[in-house]
């Protein structure tokens, strides 16, 4: 993309904003913040009008079609040649490595395109077990269980292990996948990385719940900062409380050996539950829960 392309793009945005300011009938993203008098069909139609309107000004932001595999450089619709891409979570470029592609091809040739059954009733393959053992060892845990996505790992685990007599203490910045699993249990929101408040509330609520679980991210996806993992570990041990860390954005990136946030803080083996995904640094698809053998045995039965 040359300077003229960039200049033209900026001018189109400025012109669009001017039109929005002058013409109150033009739809903007603000119109979708609160729409109390519209049903879902009306909202979706209006949003599509907004997308179409943006495209008229050369600002297509949704459903941009790629013509090559996602990487640092890729080809997309509307442009000749390659563009620099900042949209991917494939941090290490694993999805485009020849070894990764070859392994995928060999697995399909041997096993087909899917197990076509739940793991508990016949869809559990030897390569699943190998992957579970490998990822558990990699993140410093005893055992692991696989899921079809990182989102499913968080939501599925939490729905399985927490009930009405339990509670989750959650950092205010944790991922939506974790909050979506907190149905049918008690939840308390803790300020972001607020160790002192967590310490106080755990002390105050000692003996009130059967299972107490603190949920944090290793690397927070929306602002990129780290959890205060060593302090969380200390507080949870002090109050006999379980600690769960979603390390989707830390594994493969953080730590001397890329083993995640626990590796970065030299805390491998000290976090009760670690969840993650294969769709980021591993450049593939799927998710996992890694924990003690006792915890994962419960997860395999209930999930």
Show the residue positions of the predicted features.
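Active-site PLP attachment segment
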Residues: 263-298
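Conserved N-terminal alpha-helix of the aminotransferase class I/II PLP-enzyme fold
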Residues: 102-149
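Active-site-proximal loop->helix
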Residues: 176-186
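Conserved PLP-anchoring active-site segment centered on the Schiff-base-forming lysine
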Residues: 157-176
């Amino acid at each position: 993309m040359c300077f003229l392309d960039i200049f033209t793009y900026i001018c189109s945005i400025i012109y669009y904003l001017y039109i929005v300011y002058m013409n109150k009938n033009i739809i903007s993203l603000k119109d979708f913040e609160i729409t109390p008098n519209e049903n879902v069909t009306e909202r979706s139609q209006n949003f599509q009008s907004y997308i179409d309107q943006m495209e008229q000004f050369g600002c297509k932001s949704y459903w941009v079609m790629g013509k090559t595999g996602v990487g640092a450089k890729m080809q997309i619709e509307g442009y000749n040649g390659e563009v620099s891409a900042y949209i991917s979570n494939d941090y290490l470029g694993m999805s485009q490595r020849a070894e990764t592609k070859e392994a995928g091809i060999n697995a399909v040739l041997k096993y087909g395109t899917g197990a076509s059954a739940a793991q508990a009733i016949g869809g559990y393959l030897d390569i699943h077990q190998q992957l579970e053992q490998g990822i558990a060892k990699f993140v410093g845990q005893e055992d692991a269980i696989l899921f079809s996505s990182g989102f499913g790992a968080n939501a599925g685990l939490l729905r399985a292990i927490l009930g009405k007599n339990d509670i989750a203490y959650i950092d205010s910045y944790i991922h939506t996948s974790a909050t979506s699993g907190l149905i049918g249990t008690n939840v308390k929101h803790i300020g972001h990385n607020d160790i002192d408040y967590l310490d106080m509330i755990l002390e105050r609520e000692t003996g009130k719940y059967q299972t107490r679980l603190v949920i944090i991210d290793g690397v927070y996806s929306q602002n990129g900062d780290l959890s205060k993992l060593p302090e969380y570990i200390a507080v949870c041990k002090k109050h006999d409380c379980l600690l769960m860390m979603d390390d989707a954005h830390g594994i493969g990136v953080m730590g001397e050996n890329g083993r995640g946030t626990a590796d970065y803080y030299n805390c491998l083996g000290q976090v009760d539950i670690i969840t993650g995904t294969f769709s980021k640094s591993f450049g593939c698809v799927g998710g996992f829960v890694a924990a003690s053998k006792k915890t994962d045995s419960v997860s395999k039965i209930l999930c």
